Design a protein with these regions (language model features):
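Conserved Class I S-adenosyl-L-methionine
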Residues: 98-125
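Conserved beta-strand signature within the Rossmann-like core of class I S-adenosyl-L-methionine
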Residues: 81-90
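A short acidic, Gly/Pro-enriched loop at the edge of an enzyme's catalytic core
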Residues: 38, 42-53
Length: 153
């Protein structure tokens, strides 16, 4: 690729990612920035414009579909027509309670969080609302994890 842009809200993750980029000598191609993925303005005026966006594990963190749409609209604003969005889903999980107690970093350490499950249909509708058309989906043998590919209309 000509360029790769990585983004995360956690300064710890960004610092670790930048270290790996430097260790591998990829600074001329790869950048890693600390941003809020749910703020649509963080997707504006990206240069070069992305032709591919990947969002993984982000949309399960919060129940509010408006936050999810802000993220997806941002991808829709940024990605060129004919470009692609790869997104993940978790329609269900047998260990929701354990995950909720173990993964608390995004909720200021609060144990009072449970992953927001969205049906595949709901997730696909949100992606479509943001200007993409789903063209392919893969799912694991247990029906827990999905990966979908959509094209920008």
């Amino acid at each position: 690729p000509d360029s790769v842009r990585l983004r995360d809200y956690s300064p710890i993750n960004v610092e670790a990612g930048r270290k790996l980029i430097a260790e591998r000598g990829l600074q001329d191609t790869v950048t890693f920035d600390e941003v809020n993925a749910y703020d649509r303005t963080n997707y504006q005026d990206l240069q070069p414009r992305p032709t591919l966006g990947i969002v993984s594990g982000l949309h399960e963190l919060f129940a509010d579909n408006d936050l999810i749409l802000n993220s997806l609209y941002g991808f829709g604003d940024a990605i060129e027509t004919g470009g692609y969005l790869i997104y993940t889903g978790q329609p269900w999980h047998p260990q929701l309670e354990m995950i909720a107690r173990a993964l608390t970093s995004h909720k200021a350490g609060s144990p009072n969080w449970v992953m927001r499950r969205r049906s595949q249909r709901e997730m696909d509708q949100l992606v479509e609302k943001a200007g993409f058309e789903k063209i392919r989906q893969w799912i694991d043998e247990y029906g827990i994890f999905t990966v979908s590919l959509a094209v920008k209309k």
